[in-house]
Regions:
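Cross-family detector of peptidyl-prolyl cis-trans isomerase
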Residues: 2-162
């Protein structure tokens, strides 16, 4: 029994080391990718280090979301390898989400956008899923999102005025 427990403990320790190594490798790749990307024409950087490019600007005067807004968006998330890990386009329908429940990069960027805007975000790991990763997203991975803000919706239980 002790031998089984020792083997299990060693297996877990090795798996943790492998995840840490993967995160470190991805963090290095993220730094290189983002440093090079920042030099491209049209790429701007937000205070957090999230980079963005305006693909299409919507009409002026549209209402920007706040941190607690519900937003209707179409989006595609990719790794820097080009692998798509999530896409509302592939599902054939936009998503409605509460902004304060999203990754920090989305919260920051969407508050700068207006309905009709389409941006490409280049997300450092600490503004995405960090050293843990999530699902198909490896630990420490930089991310690329194409986001189209379709609408800012009234929060549930609130009366929209005007």
């Amino acid at each position: 029994m002790r031998r089984v427990l020792a083997v299990a403990a060693m297996t877990l320790a090795l798996a943790a080391c492998k995840a840490d190594q993967t995160a470190l490798e991805n963090l290095g790749a993220a730094q290189s990718f983002l440093a090079e990307n920042a030099r491209k024409p049209g790429v701007k950087t937000l205070p957090s280090g999230v980079q963005y490019e305006v693909v299409r600007a919507g009409p002026e005067g549209g209402r920007k979301p706040t941190a607690r807004s519900l937003v209707k968006v179409h989006y595609e998330g990719r790794l820097i390898s080009g692998e798509v890990f999530d896409s509302s386009y592939e599902r054939g329908a936009p998503a409605v989400m509460r902004l304060d429940r999203l990754i920090p990069a989305w919260v920051e960027a969407l508050q700068q956008m207006r309905p009709g805007d389409e941006w490409t975000l280049y997300v450092p790991p600490e503004q995405g899923y960090g050293e843990e990763g999530a699902g198909q997203i490896p630990p420490g991975a930089p991310l690329i999102f194409r986001i189209e803000l379709i609408d800012v919706l009234p929060a549930p239980g609130r009366i929209q005025q005007g």
